[in-house]
Amino acid sequence: MSTEHSKRAAKFTQNVEKTTWHDATFWSVRQKRDKMAQELPEWEDLREHASEIKMHTITHLADYLDMFSKNLESRGVKVHWAKDAQEFNEIVLGILKDHNVKKMVKSKSMLTEECEMNPYLEQHGIDVVETDLGERIIQLLGQKPSHIVMPAIHLKREEVGKMFEEKGISKEIGNYDPTYLTRCARHHLRDQFMEAGAGMTGCNFGVAATGDCVVCTNEGNADMTTSMPKLHIVAMGIEKLVPDYKSLAVFQRLLCRCGTGQPTTAFTSHFRQARPGAEMHVVLVDNGRSDILADKDHWQTLKCMRCGACMNTCPVYRRSGGYSYTYFIPGPIGVNLGMLKNPQKYSDNVSACTLCLSCDNVCPSKVGPGSQIYAWRQSLDKLGKADSVKKAMSNGMKYLFDRPALYTTALKFAPLVNLVPECCTHFSHWNAWGIGHAKPEFAKKSFHQLWKEGKVK
């Protein structure tokens, strides 16, 4: 059966040069991550500790949420609770309307992508400007992020340069030097910061013991977003909490090393309260996270810190791109989150996995995305989403393997497959595996026969 992912992936791989470049780009990030890990003898201890901290926090989430919100409110921060995406969007819109805001700048936030906040606000007359360079690029192109950390990594500098020329951001036609393009973007965004009436940030970590909202960036755009406007809104998923600074230190050592292969992000900003004369709001969002917590088989997805390491190492993601997935978060973690959101809608993505479990090996908080995808595959039949052809073949193989005599007899006829023309076995929608693979040749005698004849020892 041809899934939506496989159709999109086939389209992506038609451009062999770009596919190879995309693969190599992410593999280089994976190699940087490995180098960072090898420099720390305590690396595996850090991963284990991060997993334990997340497990503890999630299992005591109500207590930590209460502590976090009280610490914020004690310093004048207004805390809001959103049960779902719709309520989150309405809360944000209400805050902006109360302050008569027409333009809002924002730093990177996958939560706002999850809630589809930007189009909602734009429909209500609010101009939302992304200030992360990658996010701004894809916003101007009308695209979605293809990666949760490097949203525009699928684009080459020539594509970005031409778009900047069309939008009037770049003045030197044909100059696609990355440094020049970055400077053009900086000048373009400075005007947006000056004009905005509000700034929004995401939140990488919320420190319960102190009420800190911690934002990690490499561009400093979160600091500009909160420094210029007098209204600061923080969008935060309830799973982002850690107990204290000691716990935060563990995650800060892991996050950037796993995500981009750097020792740390260039900027780590802590927001505890509004600056004098300004106002700060924190919107804590559930949007299905409580349901995930109650799922005994897949609750560990809440341990994810959104570093993107599973995507950087995944051979399927690297060779098919982020837009091949039907859920807004691609890659191994996105497959799992999509299934938790709507298994009927996003079950196609489950096939986008080789089960190599490389993602399990690199995940800093030991979420085990590959192992969970395997578990999802086992439940496809119950969901009524199992591929009928694969199911029939599996049942046929089970029938054969349960009957040794029949299996042995069938092996004797296997060489007859060599006589079947390749056009009937390969390059056909009946056998997607055959595309790109040479036709295997069956030996005249099986290993079993050779063993019986004493020719194999």
Predicted regions and their residues:
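Ferredoxin-type iron-sulfur electron-transfer modules in oxidoreductases and energy-metabolism complexes
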Residues: 275-301, 317-422, 426, 435
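Helix N-cap / loop-to-helix initiation motif
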Residues: 84, 310, 368-369
